[in-house]
Structures are given as structure tokens and as C-alpha cells.
């Protein structure tokens, strides 16, 4: 018999996370590494555990994540979004709890493009009066 996975795609900035959830012991692997090894900063590890702690599923689900693009913060946000979507597929009754916490909504903020004639997106050259 095939193992039943629940799937969720999470996105944040330019990072895309594909998350697979199955009943298990609470092991989280990100790109074939333990989550604690993959995310070097504590904030990243904390962000990916938020939906699990909120729903009380920290020790009864195994999570496998494939992620690409973005930096550490964006990837952590993408994993959180993916875990949230996969949890909703796993148990529909969790959706109101997760939406109230704001985990279901995709954070639409993206990097603003650099404009011609400026140093960065909004930074101008220093103005000299004389």
C-alpha cells in the first residue's frame, strides 16, 4: 500500500517550497537535511514550526520539504506557508485556526524593481545645491 502524503505549495518573496506531510514522529527534513541543520538561524527554525505548534501537531507528523530560490528568511516563510496548506489538506477543521493566525494568506510583498536614473529602487543620488 502506498504511503498517503498531503501536499502543499508555499511561496514567499522568490522562494518556492513543496511540502509533503504524512503521519509519523515529528521529523522535519528540508532538502534531505534536518530542519535544524538547514536553517542556521533560530528565527528560521521558529517560523517553520509555528503552524505545527498552533495546531498541536509537532510530534505526530513527518514533514518533507523541497525548496529553491530566495534567501533564508524567504525560504522559512515559504516553508511555513506550504506546511499550512498541507495541514489544511490533512485536516480541514484546522483552517479557521490557521487563518486567524495569518498563516493561510500568502505574503504578497516582493522586491521593488530598480528604476533608471536612481541608485536603487528609491535611493537617489545625493543632491548638491552648489
Curated annotation (Swiss-Prot):
Q: Which UniProt keywords apply?
A: Ribonucleoprotein, Ribosomal protein
UniProt similarity note: Belongs to the universal ribosomal protein uS9 family.
Give an example GO cellular component term for this record. cytosolic small ribosomal subunit
TM spans (from-to): none
Q: Which Gene3D superfamilies match?
A: 3.30.230.10
Q: Name one GO biological process term.
A: translation
From the Swiss-Prot or TrEMBL record, what is one GO molecular function term?
Answer: RNA binding
Report the domain of life of the source organism: Bacteria
- Origin species: Nitrosomonas europaea (strain ATCC 19718 / CIP 103999 / KCTC 2705 / NBRC 14298)
Report the protein name in the record. Small ribosomal subunit protein uS9
